[in-house]
Each structure stands twice: as structure tokens, then as C-alpha cells.
Amino acid sequence: MIPAKPFLCVITDEQCSSPVDLALMALEGGAEMIQLRHKSASGKQLFQWALDIQRLCRIHHAQFIVNDRVDIALAMNADGVHLGQQDLQPGEARKLLGTDKIIGVSTSSLTEALNAERAGADYIGFGHIFQTGSKNKLSAPLGSAAISAVVQRISIPLVAIGGINKMNMMETIAAGASGIAMIAAISRTADPEGATRAITELLKGH
């Protein structure tokens, strides 16, 4: 089940030495969803991290999502999977995971958002909204106005991502985002738990 809006999804940072420790700090700070994302880790390492993070998510009553790897999500019964545009199609992932799992899809345009919904996604990640250093981005930021344009055309939740921080996050919620996804704003701070708590408290006060 997708958390009640507005919610925070913390995505693990590949520059972080321990995704499990980061997940724990984010959960202690009140994050409602954790997404394990690590493109270069081995399947064995990802699976172990996934097991550890899922256990923590269960304790904290949070949702656990695996990025890209439907096989790992299936093997360890994760709450869901998040797919990129070049990954398995949502409909195919649904056949493998079943109807009760969460399937998210990364999008960066209205067309991609509409296609993701038609294909059976439960939510879309939409961005990048603001300038970000978490990934190498060649395209210009979409801006919060793009969120408003998309949410008027889809019926599934939109999770805003890309350059979102404590200073601009409420702009995305006001534009219609159901949730926000963060990487650097949590992982690259001296106190990830405190940073998460400050953000979740702002969201609760919305």
C-alpha cells in the first residue's frame, strides 16, 4: 500500500557506505518508504541489503521498494519495485509480483506518465524537478509547474524527485505531488535522521 500523502521516500545513495545504516536513520526519522537503489552492487549484495532493510521497514511500519530488480523484489517478498523507462514493463512485472505489490515507474514527461498509468503502474516518479547533483543530468529541470500539468491528467500518485530539499519541497506538494523522493538531501548531511525528521514533520504539518 502506498503511504498516505504527503509522504517521504528516501532512496539509498550509492556513495553511502552502508545503505542499511542510512535506511535505519531515515526510518528513525519518520520516512514512510525506503527504496534500495544501487546500480553497481552484485545481486548477492543487493539481496542481503534488501533483506536487512525490509526487516527494518517492517519494524517501522514503512514500505520497502527495490529499484529495477524485479527478481530480488520477488525473491524476498518486497513491498514493491520501482522501474526505469528501460526496465521491465509494469504489466510484465505485475505478472511476476502479483496484484498486491507496489509498482512505480520513473517518468520525465506527460507522455511517459500517461503510458506508465496505462501499463498498470501504482505511482510514478516524476523529475528531475530541480537542479540535482545526485545523477548526471543532461536535461533541464522540469520545475514544479510540470507537476501540476501531469497530475491533472493522471489518477495515480505522483512522487516528485530531483533536487528536492527542505527549502523547495513544499512547492512540489502545493503543485500536486503526493510524495517526494530524496537522496542527497538525506544521505549527504551530517545527521540523516535529523534531516529526515525535519522533512517528515513539515509534511505532516501540511
Curated annotation (Swiss-Prot):
Assigned GO CC terms: cytoplasm
Enzyme Commission code(s) on record: 2.5.1.3
Binding site for Mg(2+): D68, D87
Record keywords: Magnesium, Metal-binding, Thiamine biosynthesis, Transferase
Binding site for 2-[(2R,5Z)-2-carboxy-4-methylthiazol-5(2H)-ylidene]ethyl phosphate: T132, G133, S134, G163
Alphabetized Gene3D superfamilies for the sequence: Aldolase class I
UniProt pathway: Cofactor biosynthesis; thiamine diphosphate biosynthesis; thiamine phosphate from 4-amino-2-methyl-5-diphosphomethylpyrimidine and 4-methyl-5-(2-phosphoethyl)-thiazole: step 1/1
Cofactor note: Binds 1 Mg(2+) ion per subunit.
Binding residue positions for 4-amino-2-methyl-5-(diphosphooxymethyl)pyrimidine: Q35, L36, R37, H38, K39, N67, S106, K135
Recorded catalytic activity of this chain's protein: 2-[(2R,5Z)-2-carboxy-4-methylthiazol-5(2H)-ylidene]ethyl phosphate + 4-amino-2-methyl-5-(diphosphooxymethyl)pyrimidine + 2 H(+) = thiamine phosphate + CO2 + diphosphate; 2-(2-carboxy-4-methylthiazol-5-yl)ethyl phosphate + 4-amino-2-methyl-5-(diphosphooxymethyl)pyrimidine + 2 H(+) = thiamine phosphate + CO2 + diphosphate; 4-methyl-5-(2-phosphooxyethyl)-thiazole + 4-amino-2-methyl-5-(diphosphooxymethyl)pyrimidine + H(+) = thiamine phosphate + diphosphate
GO biological processes: thiamine biosynthetic process; thiamine diphosphate biosynthetic process
Molecular functions per Gene Ontology: magnesium ion binding; thiamine-phosphate diphosphorylase activity
InterPro entries for this protein: Aldolase_TIM, ThiamineP_synth_sf, ThiamineP_synth_TenI, TMP_synthase
Known cofactor(s): Mg(2+)
SUPFAM superfamilies membership: Thiamin phosphate synthase
Pfam family, one: TMP-TENI
Superkingdom in the source lineage: Bacteria
Similarity remark: Belongs to the thiamine-phosphate synthase family.
NCBIfam families: thiE
Function, as annotated: Condenses 4-methyl-5-(beta-hydroxyethyl)thiazole monophosphate (THZ-P) and 2-methyl-4-amino-5-hydroxymethyl pyrimidine pyrophosphate (HMP-PP) to form thiamine monophosphate (TMP).
Protein known as: Thiamine-phosphate synthase
Gene name for this UniProt entry: thiE
